[in-house]
Amino acid sequence: MYKRPRFNRVLLKLSGEVLMGPGQFGIDPATVARVADEIRAAREAGYQLCIVVGGGNIFRGLAATARGIERSSADYMGMLATVMNAIAVQNALENLGVDTRVQSAIPMPTVCEPFIRRRAERHMEKGRVVIFAAGTGNPFFTTDSGAALRAAEMKCDALFKGTSVDGVYDADPKKVKEARRYDCVSFNRVLADDLKVMDASATALCRDNNIPIVVFNIREQGNFSRVLKGDGVSTIVCNEEE
């Protein structure tokens, strides 16, 4: 049976959709402020935090490819969207007094720092929140893969994926009323059953580096801090299974 360890350094993966709140597109300032307050509370509780943000609220590379934009170009456009989201989250955190740095995998020195692993580690050791933008910096990789990569590089204890559902289910809970939520599920089952936690390459990277993935509902007020302490509703994806 899986025994959950004490997490100290964690990476929070936020989808772009979380940042658009009740809207259908773009950034909702009230939602970003609420998410920032969740992050502030976790930081004040003593956790070292880094964040990866998606860009789907602004631009979706795969959807654009289907409409005729060349795949690499579409992916780069999506990476730039994540930088916009990262700056929005940084602004919201700094409004709350949280010292924050944005590092981009695509260098843009007038906007933010380039990604430098050792510098990012020093920021976190000094109590700063680090937001990683532009995914891996390469086309054909999702921001989920970018999150898994950064979690491994930063030696994070876990990757927390904030979504609009409270965990991983054996079927789509929006379509199947009897769908069962897992408290704990193995990486291999997620991959074999295609449970859609993250894309396969991100899941495999976390498995190979023994980084648990914690899936939880970021839209519920105060839930991030509860799940960090082991009190909230979530699913843990790990190398063991209940």
From Swiss-Prot:
Q: Where in the cell is it found?
A: Cytoplasm
| Catalysed reaction equations from the record | UMP + ATP = UDP + ADP
Query: What keyword terms does UniProt attach to this protein?
Result: ATP-binding, Cytoplasm, Kinase, Nucleotide-binding, Pyrimidine biosynthesis, Transferase
Pathway of action: Pyrimidine metabolism; CTP biosynthesis via de novo pathway; UDP from UMP (UMPK route): step 1/1
Q: Does the keyword Iron apply?
A: no
Subunit info?
Homohexamer.
One GO molecular function term of this record is: UMP kinase activity
Q: What's one Pfam family the UniProt record gives for this protein?
A: AA_kinase
Where would one find coiled-coil regions in this protein?
Answer: none
Which positions does UniProt annotate for ATP binding?
13-16, 56, 60, 163, 169, 172
Supply the name of the protein: Uridylate kinase
UniProt-listed GO biological process terms? 'de novo' CTP biosynthetic process; UDP biosynthetic process
What NCBIfam families does this protein map onto?
A: pyrH_bact
Described by its record, this protein's role is as follows:
Catalyzes the reversible phosphorylation of UMP to UDP.
Q: How is its activity regulated?
A: Inhibited by UTP.
Tell me its EC number(s), please: 2.7.4.22
- Give the family, as the similarity comment puts it: Belongs to the UMP kinase family.
Q: Domain of life here? A: Bacteria
